[in-house]
A protein has these predicted regions:
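Amphipathic alpha-helical coiled-coil/heptad-repeat segments
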Residues: 1-202
Length: 202
């Protein structure tokens, strides 16, 4: 049976488009048929799982097969989004779209900065910080495959530009909670844009 998937079509929470999948296997890619009219589409988080069952023609980009060859299992991959983007880009010459992988996790907005203890980001221990800027600086200095930025609303965004996993852990206690984050493994996203700047059709 068909399932729904939500595409983010802009930077705001209200900028989304829900479309139906023609088979359940495409759920793991966050891509589906039926969306058009926007210059950029962003998938849901791309799970690290077995994608070998997704056929090259299961999804059409601008009316053409989205892949030139089937994907392998990504169950042990730490960069599933990047692998999907690379596979889509192998067929760019046919469908005319470019895929880009990225990842980001943004904290909740807190009334004041607090970091109760150390946290672990992608396996690296980030020392207890006493200001938001100090925490951002420590992440940028120490964390492997992750950068941090302080937003105007005082939230903090952890991000990368390759779609690699962002793994947040809190072995010592409540450091992440006080920062406004939740311990988890966060998979990356894939964006689609046509290389000629026209609207993408999926």
């Amino acid at each position: 049976s068909n399932k729904d998937v939500t595409f983010q079509t802009g930077i705001n929470a209200t900028d989304f488009l829900t479309v139906g999948l023609k088979n359940a296997s495409t759920t793991s890619l966050g891509l589906a048929s039926g969306s058009s009219g926007v210059a950029k589409l962003t998938s849901e988080r791309v799970g690290a799982d077995d994608k070998s069952g997704v056929g090259v023609s299961d999804i059409k980009i601008n009316g053409q097969n989205f892949l030139s060859a089937t994907l392998a299992t990504l169950a042990s991959s730490t960069e599933a989004a990047g692998a999907v983007a690379d596979a889509i880009n192998l067929n760019t010459g046919v469908h005319g779209a470019k895929a880009t992988a990225f990842n980001e996790v943004t904290s909740t907005i807190t009334s004041k900065f607090e970091m109760a203890d150390v946290v672990e980001i992608n396996g690296e221990v980030i020392a207890q910080s006493y200001s938001a800027q100090e925490f951002v600086d420590n992440v940028n200095l120490l964390a492997d495959g992750v950068q941090a930025r302080l937003n105007a609303d005082t939230s903090i965004t952890l991000f990368n530009n390759d779609g690699g996993q962002i793994i947040l852990a809190d072995a010592a206690g409540t450091g992440l909670t006080t920062l406004g984050f939740t311990a988890a493994t966060y998979e990356g996203y894939v964006t689609l844009e046509n290389i000629d700047g026209s609207a993408v059709s999926i």
